[in-house]
């Protein structure tokens, strides 16, 4: 089972709101998921990002692959740097 960390779209039409979720790569975008890691609201100025850092690092260390957008969000929050440092043993 390949696990991905990706965005699940919520909110009304033309007013998107996303949950950052851990899901099986075979499940649909807005379908079944394993766990919610955070939220992302691109409509708010500035864009609002809330991520549970512990959960995100746990899933990255377990082998979950983040989507491109989630990788960018994690990088802006400093999570990817912490993950790489932990992986290299620093």
UniProtKB/Swiss-Prot annotation:
One of its GO terms (biological process) is translation. GO terms for cellular component: cytoplasm; small ribosomal subunit. PROSITE patterns: RIBOSOMAL_S16. GO terms for molecular function: structural constituent of ribosome. Keywords: Ribonucleoprotein, Ribosomal protein. Signal peptide: none annotated. It comes from the Bacteria. NCBIfam families: S16. Belongs to the bacterial ribosomal protein bS16 family. This is Small ribosomal subunit protein bS16. It comes from Bacillus velezensis (strain DSM 23117 / BGSC 10A6 / LMG 26770 / FZB42) (Bacillus amyloliquefaciens subsp. plantarum). The lineage of its organism: Bacteria, Bacillati, Bacillota, Bacilli, Bacillales.
